[in-house]
């Protein structure tokens, strides 16, 4: 199979855990949704979760909004620091919706699991995956590719599961990122080569692939990065990262293709470095 080659110019210096059911309130008691609505914060409309503090008149406000207020938003009375133990007991019997329910998450779960779930929820907003651009954009997963196509037009996209990622001018000083996109199997993958300069002047390169998709979707693929030339070969194989988790942690832990300047020079041609990239389905 012939490989496509494109030039990448320097750009600049789990799935949701299942809910655990708690004993349901039955008989003449209100439905779970009605009970959960009693815990809505009157300021941000998120949920007031234990420890629950009330004003002198019994009104509630969430822990995020409370430090920003000087009086109760409902009655304008003093906030006070009175624990509402009765509501805390009720909260232990309620299944709360995920804060990203409006984006499509249907999980309901005990308040003790809510924060951990929302940290990993795949319906939370995605950040722009483009490194080195200082882009602050956030949006839904479906909006990521349109954002990249309109706001980061310099990124080249190649079609096919077997391509060559050509990073130009790898001898540029300082920290530099090279980025390109690969489209295959109905998905888009972002290929990143990042050069970091350490405090002692030592430079390292980090190459990694991330899927424009969820963690669950990423588990269906594998990628191989290969430096090949002058009768030498250096290869890395792994599961692509989801843009949900990003690549910063993987690079920090060297969980990617890592090589220093001396290795790069063994494979470079006229200051340009070609990386063979192969995407396969598991």
UniProtKB/Swiss-Prot annotation:
Residues in the signal sequence: none
Outcome, altering residue 142 to A: In E; does not impair its ability to interact with CACYBP and degrade CTNNB1
Effect on the protein upon substituting residue 237 to A: In A; does not impair its ability to degrade PML while it abolishes its ability to interact with CACYBP and degrade CTNNB1
Chain residue ranges for the region called Disordered: 1-22
Tissue-level expression: Widely expressed at a low level. Down-regulated in advanced hepatocellular carcinomas.
Broad enzyme group: transferase
InterPro entries, sorted: 7-in-absentia-prot_TRAF-dom, SINA-like_animal, Sina-like_RING, TRAF-like, Znf_RING, Znf_RING/FYVE/PHD, Znf_SIAH
Annotated residues for binding of Zn(2+) 1: 98, 105, 117, 121
Description of what induces expression: May be induced by p53/TP53, suggesting that it may be required to modulate p53/TP53 response. The relevance of such activity in vivo is however unclear and may not exist.
Binding, Zn(2+) 2: 128, 135, 147, 152
Localization: Cytoplasm; Nucleus
Main location: cytoplasm
GO molecular function ontology, one term from the record: ubiquitin protein ligase activity
The enzyme's E.C. designation: 2.3.2.27
UniProt keyword list: Apoptosis, Cell cycle, Cytoplasm, Developmental protein, Differentiation, Disease variant, Intellectual disability, Metal-binding, Nucleus, Phosphoprotein, Spermatogenesis, Transferase, Ubl conjugation pathway, Zinc, Zinc-finger
Function: E3 ubiquitin-protein ligase that mediates ubiquitination and subsequent proteasomal degradation of target proteins. E3 ubiquitin ligases accept ubiquitin from an E2 ubiquitin-conjugating enzyme in the form of a thioester and then directly transfers the ubiquitin to targeted substrates. Mediates E3 ubiquitin ligase activity either through direct binding to substrates or by functioning as the essential RING domain subunit of larger E3 complexes.
Record note on quaternary structure: Homodimer. Interacts with group 1 glutamate receptors GRM1 and GRM5. Interacts with DAB1, which may inhibit its activity. Interacts with UBE2E2. Interacts with PEG3. Interacts with GAPDH; leading to stabilize SIAH1. Component of some large E3 complex composed of UBE2D1, SIAH1, CACYBP/SIP, SKP1, APC and TBL1X. Interacts with UBE2I. Interacts with alpha-tubulin. Interacts with PEG10, which may inhibit its activity. Interacts with KHDRBS3. Interacts with SNCAIP.
Disease involvement: Buratti-Harel syndrome: An autosomal dominant neurodevelopmental disorder characterized by hypotonia apparent in early infancy, global developmental delay, delayed walking, language and speech delay, impaired intellectual development, and dysmorphic facial features.
The record's note on its domains: The RING-type zinc finger domain is essential for ubiquitin ligase activity.
Protein name in UniProt: E3 ubiquitin-protein ligase SIAH1
Species in which this protein is naturally found: Homo sapiens (Human)
């Amino acid at each position: 199979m012939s490989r496509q080659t494109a030039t990448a110019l320097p750009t600049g210096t789990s799935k949701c855990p299942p809910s655990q059911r708690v004993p349901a309130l039955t008989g003449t008691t209100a439905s779970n949704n009605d009970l959960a609505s009693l815990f809505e914060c009157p300021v941000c409309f998120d949920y007031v979760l234990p420890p629950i503090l009330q004003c002198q008149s019994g009104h509630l406000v969430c822990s995020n909004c409370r430090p920003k207020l000087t009086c109760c938003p409902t009655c304008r009375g003093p906030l006070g620091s009175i624990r509402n133990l009765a509501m805390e007991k009720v909260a232990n019997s309620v299944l709360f919706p995920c804060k990203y329910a409006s984006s499509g998450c249907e999980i309901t779960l005990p308040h003790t699991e809510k924060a951990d779930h929302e940290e990993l929820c795949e319906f939370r907003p995605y950040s722009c995956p483009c490194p080195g651009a200082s882009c602050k954009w956030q949006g839904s997963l479906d909006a990521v590719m349109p954002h990249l196509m309109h706001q980061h037009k310099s990124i080249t996209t190649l079609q096919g599961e077997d391509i060559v990622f050509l990073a130009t001018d790898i001898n540029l000083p300082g920290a530099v990122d090279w980025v390109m996109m690969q489209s295959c199997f109905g998905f888009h993958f972002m290929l990143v080569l990042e050069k970091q300069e350490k405090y002692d002047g030592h430079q390292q390169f980090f190459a990694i692939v991330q899927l424009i998709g969820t963690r669950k979707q990423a588990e269906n693929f594998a990628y191989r990065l290969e430096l090949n030339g002058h009768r030498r070969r250096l290869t890395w194989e792994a599961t692509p990262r989801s843009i949900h988790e990003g690549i910063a942690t993987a690079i920090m832990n060297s969980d990617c293709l890592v090589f220093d300047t001396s290795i790069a020079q063994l494979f470079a041609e006229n200051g340009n470095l070609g990386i063979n990239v192969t995407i396969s389905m598991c």
